[in-house]
Amino acid sequence: MERIDKIIASQGQYSRKEVKALIAKGRVTLDGRPLTSSSEKADPAAAQICIDGKPLEFKRNLYLMLHKPKGYVSATEDREHPTVLELVPPEFRGRELFPAGRLDRDTTGLMIITDDGVLAHNILAPKKHIPKLYHVQLDIPVTDAMRAGFLEGVRLNDGVCKAAELLRTGTCTAQVTLREGRYHQIKRMFGCYGAEVVELKRLGMGRLYLPEDLEEGACRELTPAELALLQKR
């Protein structure tokens, strides 16, 4: 059981102060009866809470998919650059959201933004080995030596990388699948072969892939089917 004002405020549309004002004005009902106190408790999964006659759709956690554009940092706040949270639709910003993982400021593609710490751990923890798929464009042609080296494990100054799959898709383009996430890892791996990464885009995480119709900068909720794909091992 939780306090009504906490339940409503947790959904991100109203602050607890605003919820108390709504209740005082008789605009909130619980199971069909007007509420008179914000301290009353209810089971958020079972109770029917309405605001101005409209049922509150309670969501314990929120899961958003963002097509990250260049220029945004993967953080909740930053003094120098805009953050990915600034791309979240206003109706979700009242929740304690954070990016599940990071992409460099000049990297684009799929990001998950959530308030579910358990899910974030499950898709980011090294022991989980969740594959992440990237599109890469280089300044020089992709070579067989790169492919073989990635599969064997590239040695960086912070250790040997786990085996990575490299699929050449064009003269200077490839898809890379990683199962770990080191700092600037793909850029450093190609740097070992004298190549510079000029474009980097994340296409997928686990079994979830970036939809072709989600434009850069767009952010929306995951569908139940997409969430299930993200959680599959």
Predicted regions and their residues:
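Basic, flexible Lys/Arg- and Gly-enriched helix-loop patches that mediate nucleic-acid binding at interfaces
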Residues: M1-R233
